[in-house]
C-alpha cells in the first residue's frame, strides 16, 4: 500500500516527528510541566511514539548526547493531554475547578484506556507532583492506544508553521484516546476544519489567507528531546 502521509517532497522520507491525525501510539513517559507564564498552571505532557516506521526512515536519537546511540523506531512527539493547562479556577457560573481533581480525572481516563485502573487506584502520593511521577511509571510502556492528535499551529521566527500537539477535548462527538480493538469505537476522527482539532494560525505577511500550506522547504516542526 502506497501512502505519502508524513513525507516531504524534499526528501521523500517520513518525518521523525509525529503530526496531527489518527495514530496508534505508545507512551514513553509522562511529565507534569509548569507553564512559563503561570506558576500555578500545569500541562500534562504525553511523550509518545508511533508504531515502528519501515523503509527509509531515521528516528530521533534517544540520547542526543550520544550520536552513535539507538534511535526511536517510530515518530515521536510531545502531546498535551488537554488543549488548556490545569489550574484552580472559578467559572463565570461560580463553579470551582480544582486543578488536582481534574488531573486525577485525566489519569483515570488514561488508565482505563490502558486497562491499568487497578494500578492507578493503588498509587499513594503526598503531592500532585509525586502522584504524576508515579503515573508516568505506571502508564508508560509498550502498550499501544488509538489517539486523535490535534494541534495549535504557531509560526516560528523563520516563518515556518509548527504544531503544538494536544488531545482534542472529549465531547459528544467522541473521545481523543481509546484502547485498541474497541467495539463500537467512539474515537474522534481528525478533522482539520474542526477548531477543536486544529487551531490554525494566519501566516505573517499573508493577510489574505488564514491557512498555511507548507512547501517542501517549510516543513519546520521543532522537536527537542
Identify the residue ranges that each predicted region occupies.
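Short beta-rich binding modules
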Residues: 1-225
